[in-house]
Amino acid sequence: MKASELKDKTVEQLQEELLGLRREQFNLRMQAATGQLNQTHMMKQVRRDIARVKTILNEKAGA
């Protein structure tokens, strides 16, 4: 997910995206804890996507 794609979305869409990413992060953590996670790079990718969404939300709140 690119920041330029996120800037085109509304605040409501960004909040929905953030909620979905947090759920995905939770599921990945549970899979890692039980030893079922094969693609460990996904945890890092989701964490950074969450940071991107939160950054854009803060930018929109300040504007």
Curated annotation (Swiss-Prot):
The answer to whether UniProt assigns keyword Ribosomal protein to this entry is yes
Leader sequence residues: none
Tell me if Protease is a UniProt keyword of this record: no
What protein is this chain from?
Large ribosomal subunit protein uL29
* Gene Ontology MF annotations: structural constituent of ribosome
Assigned protein family? Belongs to the universal ribosomal protein uL29 family.
Under the heading Pfam families, the entry gives:
Ribosomal_L29
GO biological process terms, alphabetically, are:
translation
Q: Which gene encodes it?
A: rpmC
GO cellular component terms, alphabetically, are: cytosolic large ribosomal subunit
The UniProt keyword set, sorted, is: Ribonucleoprotein, Ribosomal protein
Q: Which InterPro entries match?
A: Ribosomal_protein_uL29, Ribosomal_uL29, Ribosomal_uL29_CS, Ribosomal_uL29_sf
